[in-house]
Structures are given as C-alpha cells and as structure tokens.
Amino acid sequence: MIIKRTPQAASPLASWLSYLENLHSKTIDLGLERVSQVAARLGVLKPAPFVFTVAGTNGKGTTCRTLESILMAAGYKVGVYSSPHLVRYTERVRVQGQELPESAHTASFAEIESARGDISLTYFEYGTLSALWLFKQAQLDVVILEVGLGGRLDATNIVDADVAVVTSIALDHTDWLGPDRESIGREKAGIFRSEKPAIVGEPEMPSTIADVAQEKSALLQRRGVEWNYSVTDHDWTFSDAHGTLENLPLPLVPQPNAATALAALRASGLEVSENAIRDGIASAILPGRFQIVSESPRVIFDVAHNPHAAEYLTGRMKALPKNGRVLAVIGMLHDKDIAGTLAWLKSVVDDWYCAPLEGPRGATAEQLLEHLGNGKSFDSVAQAWDAAMAGAKAEDTVLVCGSFHTVAHVMEVIDARRSGGK
C-alpha cells in the first residue's frame, strides 16, 4: 500500500481526505482502543458539558437536527456531528447550525496527525476525532453525536453520553451488526451509560435493548411505555412523566423522529421553554429527507436506502395528492436489501430511471431492473435525472432515492448547472 506524503494544516481539504481514505488498511475497523488513545492525547473525550449520542438504523439525522433546532431556539450553543455527507465533507460538522470553513477541518486533521503517532485510524475515526476537536475549540454548551455504524464499537462511543438515543431498529449492515433485530439492538444499545437516560423510539423494541439497559443500569425510556405521542391532521400531542404538551406544530421531519428528539430533550434535564420546543420543531429540516425541492413537476429527494426507510417514504408519497405519474431516479449500493427496498417503492412509482453507482459497492442499473421487471437503464445518475426531467409533465412527480450517493449526484448536477448559468 502506498501512503501519500502527509498533508499540512494549510493543505487543501481534498488532499487531506484523499490521504485519510488510504491511511488505514480497512475502510471499517470497529473497536475503540485506537481511537480512544488518540482522543485522550488530544483531550477531547469530553467535548462539551452535555452530550447526546444518537444511534439507530434510520432517523438519526432528523432526530439530531430536531434536537439541535430546539436547543438553539432555547439559547444553547450547539455542535452536531453527522454522517455521511451529501455534497460537501464540511456538512459533517455543524456549530450553531452552520458548517465550518475547510481551513478549520484541515487544522484539526493536522492536530490529529501530530497526536496519533504510529496509531492507524480509519477515515471515520479521523473524522470523529476532528469533530470532537472542533467542538472543544468552539466552547459549546451541548454536543450531539450521530453514530456512524452500530453503536457499541462505533468511534463516537468513546464519549460518554449524558443521554443516549436509539431511534429505530431494522435490518441493515447485517455483515457488521448481526443477522437479526435482536443482534442489531444489542449493538446499538452499546451507547447506553449507567444511571443516564436511554431513549428508545423504536415501537417494537427488541428485548436485547432492555437487556443491555439492565446490564448497564441505564434509565430506559421506551416509546409507548414511559413516553408517547399522538397525531392529528393539524397538530400533535406528546406525553411523558413530566406532563403533556399539546397542539405542537407538525414537523417537517418524520414525526417519530421529532417525538424521539423531544423525549430525549425532556429526559436531559436541560432547561428549555415550551416556546423554544415549538419554534425548534417547526424549523427543523434536513436535506435529502423527503425534501420537496420544486413544483411543476414536483421534485422530491429522499435518501431512503433500506426497506424500513422505503416503507416510510412510500407512506409519505401516498399521502400526497396525486395528479400525474411518479418517475423515480434510483441508484443503490449492492450490499443493501435492494429487493426489499424496491418492493415498497413499486406501489407508488410508475416509471423507473435506473442508474449505476460508482465504486465497488455500487449496484448496476441492470441489477436494479432485475427486481423491477420494467424501467430504463442509464450510464449515470446524471443521465437518468436528465431523462426523467425531460419526460416529466407539470403534474408529475420526480422522486430521487435509493442512496445518499444518488441524491448527492443530482444535487451536484443542479448546483453545477446553476453556477454555470445552465
């Protein structure tokens, strides 16, 4: 393996990212010993006075965004670490809702490079340490960490969470986390801490989560048991041991995730007014999550890439008033449950525009078509997008879905043409 010359603090971000991608022998190397050692050297194991850590198969990003939005509305200084990014690496770290300049990231990478010595780190471990270092520099009140993969052995778990959250449990990453919901639940519950709140948004919670909570003496708070919510056409109600909040504004993010965020917030003991809760819920939005970007034709971006997310997306699509046809631009990774994901989407999609994703994990357009029976194949996401938009009438809907990569490609095409005047 050839490792490129080490970049410097002033080197471009792209040079650093290329270096990080080739630094470690494995893309994923679960375990906390190496990354903990470097974190201790950097002094970043406590990045802020209060930390939320959020795990789950789906819903992590929007749960984090809702927490962030409410806490900022309440006047807290907040940092969020999330992954993967859609278009820019800098999306992964937000301070007060804003991305940091590339120079901040490269400065953090240089600090980590100096501190790690001969300890090898994966791309994600490096990114996690970078986020923690940036948060420490920013002198925040609250940090929200989104788990990358699983929980127990994820790099984010080097930090002791004051409140741990598991949003949902479904089959994904089974090669790493185990073959069933019970195994996956145990891995995700690995973020729980003794005598600290452990919030579970999954309504059908695997028993292993309760087992881990008991083993760790965590304060388990389950949806439908310790807290719950109900929804009408125009508002929703939340209830827990602290009381009931009524007439809450309907969120722009998935309802279960907004409720899970609220459960975590109320368990935290942080002082937040009811007005801040309402304002934060109303303003929380995350790109690529049922994001309606235009009308006539309506264009929707959604990163749904497994059956659980596709089921939710299908429900949202069915709830929309339907006038014309639904044209789907889709690309997926071959290690996802392609058949299970497409089985849900088939009920709402009329025309398929299938594209390959690059890299060793990318599925070909032909692999997608095997599960569809009909549809068109293209050489790239950009070509599929152009064809769908050319074929869409004003009353139609163009849905871009299947992967973060698919949505990101289309976003990049739109941005490039906008900046190029096309």
What are these regions (language model features)?
Residues 403:
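Active-site-proximal loop/hinge segments that shape catalytic or ion-binding/gating pockets
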Residues 50-54, 62-79:
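A conserved segment at the C-terminal end of the G1
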Residues 81-84, 200-202, 214-231, 248-252, ...:
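Beta-strand->loop->alpha-helix junctions that form or flank phosphate-binding loops
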Residues 48-50, 137, 142-147, 154-165, ...:
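Nucleotide phosphate-binding/pyrophosphate-handling subdomain across enzymes
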Residues 12, 26-28, 32-49, 73-159, ...:
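ATP-dependent carboxylate-amine ligase catalytic core
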Residues 199, 203-220, 230-235, 266, ...:
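C-terminal helical cap/extension that packs against the catalytic core
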Residues 119, 141, 146, 161-244, ...:
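Acidic, Mg2+-coordinating active-site environments of NTP-dependent enzymes
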Residues 1-27:
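Charged, amphipathic alpha-helical linker segments immediately N-terminal to NTP-binding catalytic cores
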